[in-house]
Amino acid sequence: MRILLSNDDGVHAPGIQTLAKALREFADVQVVAPDRNRSGASNSLTLESSLRTFTFENGDIAVQMGTPTDCVYLGVNALMRPRPDIVVSGINAGPNLGDDVIYSGTVAAAMEGRHLGFPALAVSLDGHKHYDTAAAVTCSILRALCKEPLRTGRILNINVPDLPLDQIKGIRVTRCGTRHPADQVIPQQDPRGNTLYWIGPPGGKCDAGPGTDFAAVDEGYVSITPLHVDLTAHSAQDVVSDWLNSVGVGTQW
């Protein structure tokens, strides 16, 4: 198995390094990751400037000022030959639950892999301690995919409780919950009196009941949420069409 491994925490982050070490025990792994933390970069792609790469002695590649999407795009189309069999993103330092997937660079890297035609996993740890647990879970899933490919055409967003492996209760297939909208902005002043703004923390849990990714992780289970790239709200198409007809938009200007 050939794995393209990326993240949004940066090439030196403990999550990606722990996962790379574990994956290399049974797979051919190429790390292509940002040279710094790009959390919250979502699906952004660098278009107005060039991208420079640096290759370390162990073969890992850092993309200077690159986003997670840049890294996967370059990895698939230029840096990994032969091309990968699968794209893996993580292990993220902190969860990507509910609405987090909108902003997450970790999920975006996996989404880019799927968009380019490859199976893709996004892996996040609900904390900053037991990366070895998340690595073991990821390796188990990848070994299973080797034996029997999962042909859903979906991204698997995997969130792992920050617990020792022997305390993980199992795996649940979940849906995304939701958070309350985030509304905190933290102002500061620089030494010259100019105002600076920091984006505040995410909103608290809103829809976090049974069946959600939040609930699974809170109860000690690994959460796997299938995600897809197509953002079309198919069930709303007829509603929008009927509304346009009723208000006359498109028939008179």
From Swiss-Prot:
Residues noted as binding a divalent metal cation in the record, renumbered to the chain: 8-9, 39, 92
GO molecular function, a single term: manganese ion binding
Keyword set includes Glycoprotein: no
EC number: 3.1.3.5, 3.1.3.6, 3.6.1.11
Gene Ontology BP term (one): UMP catabolic process
Signal peptide stretch: none
Record field: catalytic activity: a ribonucleoside 5'-phosphate + H2O = a ribonucleoside + phosphate; a ribonucleoside 3'-phosphate + H2O = a ribonucleoside + phosphate; [phosphate](n) + H2O = [phosphate](n-1) + phosphate + H(+); AMP + H2O = adenosine + phosphate
GO cellular component terms given for this protein: cytoplasm
Domain of life: Bacteria
Compartment annotation: Cytoplasm
Cofactor note: Binds 1 divalent metal cation per subunit. Highest nucleotidase activity with Mn(2+), followed by Co(2+), Ni(2+) and Mg(2+). Highest exopolyphosphatase activity with Mg(2+), followed by Co(2+) and Zn(2+).
Pfam family, one: SurE
InterPro entries per record: SurE (IPR030048), SurE-like_Pase/nucleotidase (IPR002828), SurE-like_sf (IPR036523)
Broad class of the protein's primary localization: cytoplasm
Main EC class the enzyme belongs to: hydrolase
Entry cofactors: Mn(2+); Co(2+); Ni(2+); Mg(2+)
Keywords: Cobalt, Cytoplasm, Hydrolase, Magnesium, Manganese, Metal-binding, Nickel, Nucleotide-binding, Zinc
Keyword match Membrane: no
Entries under HAMAP family matching the protein: SurE
NCBIfam families according to UniProt: PRK00346.1-1 (NF001488), PRK00346.1-3 (NF001489), PRK00346.1-4 (NF001490), surE (TIGR00087)
Subunit structure: Monomer and homooligomer in solution. The oligomeric complex consists of at least four subunits.
Function: Nucleotidase with a broad substrate specificity as it can dephosphorylate various ribo- and deoxyribonucleoside 5'-monophosphates and ribonucleoside 3'-monophosphates with highest affinity to 3'-AMP. Also hydrolyzes polyphosphate (exopolyphosphatase activity) with the preference for short-chain-length substrates (P20-25). Might be involved in the regulation of dNTP and NTP pools, and in the turnover of 3'-mononucleotides produced by numerous intracellular RNases (T1, T2, and F) during the degradation of various RNAs.
Record-given protein name: 5'/3'-nucleotidase SurE
Organism: Escherichia coli (strain K12)
